[in-house]
Amino acid sequence: MSKIIGVKHEKAAQSAIDLGIGMQLTNIARDVHEDSKMKRIYLPANWIPNISLNNLRNIDETSFKKDETISNAIQKVISLSDKFYENGFAGLKYIPLTSRLGIFIAANVYRGIGIKIKSNKKKYFRERVYLNIFEKSLITIKSILFFIFIPFMNYQYQKIRDSFPNENI
């Protein structure tokens, strides 16, 4: 996509990859129950020890211990995604102005899903977490306001992927 929107700076690629990872991690956290119904688990096995696919599919509010383990893993995924979003934002300055706002809004909408997941730890096994039109509109307005200040914000790229030698990140 970088070539399509005219990104020429090589530092932009690292940030773009990290932004994509942040968004994908949000998807993983949001879709735990839905994915389990399709016989898929994307949470790292070492974050959910002794929890099977069947456990994920049949989780309910009465199975607190397993629910707590899954909820903690989801929280870790969201916390990790935040670090990747920050790296993505660090590279926005390299993206042409014509594409920058749209990318910033999309990233903040996805990040908003993560914030909503964090605020309701038990919702993941009842329904898919999404943002309603009001929440999306509010995030869009905030993003536009923050967008003005991006050149003055001190987003610093930090190497994250190197710190996960045993993970597929």
Describe every region a protein language model picked out:
Residues 2-22, 29, 33-169:
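Catalytic cores of Mg2+-dependent Asp-rich isoprenoid enzymes
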